Structure formats: structure tokens, C-alpha cells
């Protein structure tokens, strides 16, 4: 497994950037020898509150990356933000991977490692603290981070939930 965090961001005409997280070489043993394919893991986002990820497999690396970018664009989510940080603390979970995300003061930057940092950067979140708990496999960490971002609620959402719960009690 090779991390490719140093790859350049590519801009598309719809203003969505993509960042390559990992490329894995997959080998299938067949009667005639070994067949090699590549699996790419890509995070896409517009740095304005929208982020997604995708995986792609192909016999050539560029084709795997293209497939991953297309898959990432199809499952983008919207992330609520307060300034340059997240509204509240949240724990994202996927498989055996857990990611704790905490809001941070303006100017403190992204205190996160590896895959979480890439997701936060692509979402446009500039100030956040995170801790990866459990699995450190990039795909599990990204899925747990996306799960945590999906669980975020804005202040208005919480007020609406409280009002609806209050009206049900009356």
C-alpha cells in the first residue's frame, strides 16, 4: 500500500477537487500466472462544505483514479460548519474504525493525521482536532470520518428537534 498524499489537486470544470489517498496493487493468481490490478482511494470536495470519497479498480492506475473520482462525485455529502470549524464534538464509526472530531478555535488549523486531514481539507474545514481510534486502514478511517460529518447538526436543526419533541409531549 502506498500513500500518495503529495499528489497535486486536480480542478474540474464544476469546481470539485480530488485528492488521491492510497493506491493498492491487487494480484490475482490464475493458471497462466499473476494478474495485477490497481485499486485507488480518492477524496473529492469543493472546499465549501461538500465532500465525498470513492474507490476504483482497473488494470491501469490512471483509469482506477478516474473511476474513483466518478464514484466520489456520486456520494458527496454536505457538511454544516460554524466559521471554519464544526458545530460540535462527534464520534464517527465504521467497522472497527472510530474517529473523534472536535471543534477547534479559529487559527489552530487541522490537527488530524493522514486520511482525516485530507477529508477535512476537501470539505473546507480549517480548524478541527481529531483522534483516530481503532482501525487505521485508510478506507475505514475515511468512512468513519464521513459518518461523523453526517452526524453533525446545526444549531437550527437542534432547536427544531427540541420544538417537535416538546410539541409531542404536550
UniProtKB/Swiss-Prot annotation:
Keywords: Ribonucleoprotein, Ribosomal protein, RNA-binding, rRNA-binding. Pfam families: Ribosomal_S5, Ribosomal_S5_C. One of its GO terms (molecular function) is structural constituent of ribosome. GO terms for biological process: translation. PROSITE patterns: RIBOSOMAL_S5, S5_DSRBD. One of its GO terms (cellular component) is small ribosomal subunit. Residues 16-79 form the S5 DRBM domain. It comes from the Bacteria. The keyword Ribonucleoprotein applies. Part of the 30S ribosomal subunit. Contacts proteins S4 and S8. With S4 and S12 plays an important role in translational accuracy. Located at the back of the 30S subunit body where it stabilizes the conformation of the head with respect to the body. The N-terminal domain interacts with the head of the 30S subunit; the C-terminal domain interacts with the body and contacts protein S4. The interaction surface between S4 and S5 is involved in control of translational fidelity. Belongs to the universal ribosomal protein uS5 family. This is Small ribosomal subunit protein uS5. The lineage of its organism: Bacteria, Bacillati, Bacillota, Bacilli, Lactobacillales.
